[in-house]
Amino acid sequence: IVISIVVIVNFFIRKSIKSRITRSFIEMMFITLVSTILEVVINGFFSNHIGNSMLMYHLVISYYALLLTLPTLYIYCLIYFAWKNYTFPMKTFVRIFVPYTIVLLLLITTPFTGLVFTISPKLEYTRGPLFFIFYIETAIYIIAAFLITLSERSSYSDREKVLICFFLIFVGTALIIQSLKWNSGFIGFMVSISMLFMTLLLDNPLDYFEKVNKIKNKKGFQTVTENLLRKKR
């Protein structure tokens, strides 16, 4: 909770929320903050009353909502569509938005259907017949992110390429581990490390050249400089 608040306040103080990817990151941090507060409240005040089943239900919803990028998909698809100031191909919308919506509906209705997870007579959490759908869908998003990163690699700096690849590899490895043995604590750790990677990617505290010279885009800066030199010649 403290780290989430510090990061959010830091971004607002520095007014570093202009780019689309930074706004997506801030939205993810807000979701992290809210889900963590909910978890603390449930564990601290209601765990003796709601039982293990509802506690696990909360954990699954909060962490998988983070893992499947709820803020980016829904906020940008819905708000920008409503305001009609963002070009988003319908084919892309269907390919990304519809599968995610189906999985989210399965998750929300699972107490009634038992498809994603079920509750044993001892009020213990057990995986349902469609639990694997989370891993399949998330794997699709991770592969898509890799392909996008490769196709757009010319616009990324070396630091950004390394951090993005580390982020995706970490999430992919964590999913494999989780598919073998469920551990909600490990999911929380995974989310924290993922947020650290995103912070390094966006805030860039390690790159001395960019930090000192306040150059956000080395390639763009180089292109402009070369054009000016040609004009002078």
What positions do the PLM features span?
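Extracellular-loop-to-transmembrane junctions of the mid-late helices
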Residues: 1, 103-147, 184
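Hydrophobic alpha-helical transmembrane segments of multi-pass membrane proteins
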Residues: 1-79, 96-113, 164-179
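Alpha-helical transmembrane segments of polytopic membrane proteins
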Residues: 1-2, 57-69, 126-139, 188-194
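Alpha-helical transmembrane segments in multipass membrane proteins, preferentially the mid-helix core
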Residues: 6-11, 73-77, 135-156
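Membrane-interfacial segments
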Residues: 17, 79-86, 118, 153-160, ...
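A cytosolic-side transmembrane-helix exit/cap motif
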Residues: 44-48, 75, 79, 182-187, ...
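Interfacial "cap-and-anchor" motif at the non-cytosolic start of specific transmembrane alpha-helices
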Residues: 147, 151-211
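Short regulatory alpha-helical coupling segments
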Residues: 216-233
